[in-house]
Amino acid sequence: MKMETLKQQILTAKGDVRAELVLKNARVINVFTNEIEQADVAICQGIILGVGHYTGETELDLQGKYVCPGLVDGHIHIESSMLCGPAFEQAVLPHGTTAVVTDPHEISNVAGTAGLDFMLETTKDLALSVYFMLPSCVPATGLDESGAVLEAEQLRPYYQQPRVLGLAELMNSYGTVRADEKIMQKIRDCTAAGKKIDGHAPFLSGEELNAYVTAGVQSDHECSDIHEAMEKLRRGQYIMVREGTAAQNMDSLLPLFREPYCSRCMLVTDDKHPGDLLQGGHIDYIIRKAIAAGVDPVVAVRMGTLVPCQYFGLAHSGAVAPGYTADLIVLSDLEQFTVEQVYKNGKLVAQQGKMLHPAALAVDKARFARVFDSFNMDEITPEQLQLKQTGTRQRVICLTPHSLLTTEKIVPFCQHPGTAPGVDVAQKIVKLAVFERHHRSGHVGLGFLGNYGLQCGAVASSIAHDSHNLIVAGTNDADMVLAGNTVRKNKGGLAFALNGQVVGELPLPVAGLMSTESAEAVEEKLQALKAALKAHGISEDIDAFMTLAFVSLPVIPRLRLNTYGIVDVDAQQIVPAVF
């Protein structure tokens, strides 16, 4: 900073020079002292220079409205919104989110460093600050078949990027606590760069948790009960309280929303569908929900602002105080957390739920050919769905409402007219398949899914964490083939087939994960699909696509299905579907 600039800032803060912008007569949410101050907020050149009594070149009388720091999502996968950067910004910035920390491991699993470069390129000029954690597990484990493999040497150069804050969720906790050499190399590089390492270790406890933290893992977003969260807090980790589309853990973790725990806890969404962002909100939604549950509003705000900024080392961000970046939101109502205005670097960027100057997606498709042409598989045939009956019992992967966890259920092998062998609609058991789509290997994993609720037809999705192969669930093979081939034809997306007809589809041509359309356009097609599926039995407490997308992730207990077959996550072994 030039000496003259600093001098002007000091004189403005002192009140000797008029500020560029003053938000007058505000109620300022102070996240340092947990109080609300009656004051003006003085802003110059994107920086807050004072909280007190000020005059400005431009003055805005807030008439007692609240001024709050801009909200920060400490852990999200933008790709899970199905939106590219500009459309994602339009969905979250009007809700008061001024910064996100994203882990682009979805697109990196499909397209490797080309996917990472795509995300960096398409978010660099947004008003929304988009920071990155480098994908640590591409693929998630050795028992997965991704489109790319990212080792330490591929990640190392990215630590020089100013928007890269560290190494993203170490999902392979099994390998981490056993000092796997490749994981150790990634940890070493991140530590040498002075950056953060995020965790992902559901139910890790005792000595293994000690080993995980010793490795340098400083946070966790997978806690689903208070006892797990407390143990991790005691071992020095920060807790990311997750409230997303599929995984909703806030209610179980409400005891953390008070001292002394709240200073080590932050709010995150992890994965959010576009409709939830547009209608319910983003971090503002979690704060509203917490306040409704009896949480002190200022504590909830602190967990969505200052705490993530302190954790990630985002200096001079996350508070309304002198010297802090003027990323601010104006609230008309604190209890309802109603966002009226959003300021980014002191400039008004959103008002009454709309961005003032939305950005458009501008990208060289030729440069990112691997991103826009990500399907490398042959047409699906009925023969690929043939499951050999090698026994009298079948293993069912059972979904858990409002959770990513699954359970195991063993039932007698069944055959009913009009459905594929093993399908029992009355018992909510459907057939499940995962087709490899990156290397034309022809690998197919087959199994059974419980509690999904589908009564007829088939659902297909190229969003299938984390390797994002093609996952299909259905009651009969013919519709499964049709739904899967529809997604293949569209180079990615979602589809629902019924009685030999495609009832609905949502193309996602960007790595098979994202659309180039607006959030509203994507949501309209998504809701039409969800409505059709709901009419055909999908369980009320299951998100038809978000929940299905996690069924193939072999790092969350208990059972998963990928291109190799059914994975016992705890044992990290393939187990038979029929035995």
Task: Give the positions of each predicted feature.
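Active-site microenvironment of metallo-dependent hydrolases
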Residues: M1-A39, I43-C44, G52, L93-H95, ...
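Divalent-metal coordination cores built from histidine and acidic residues
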Residues: K2-T12, E89-G194, P260, V503-P507
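Divalent metal-coordination and catalytic microenvironments
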Residues: A26, G46, G64, H75, ...
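Active-site mouth loops of central-metabolism enzymes
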Residues: D73-C84, P139-L150, Q218
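Active-site beta-loop-alpha junctions enriched in small/polar residues
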Residues: H77-E79, H105-I107, P135-A140, L170-S173, ...
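Short acidic, glycine/serine/threonine-rich loops at helix termini
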Residues: A111-G115, T141-G147, R178-K182, E208-Y212, ...
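Histidine/acidic residue-rich metal-binding segments in metalloenzymes
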Residues: V149-E169, G175-M240, A247-V268, L278-A292, ...
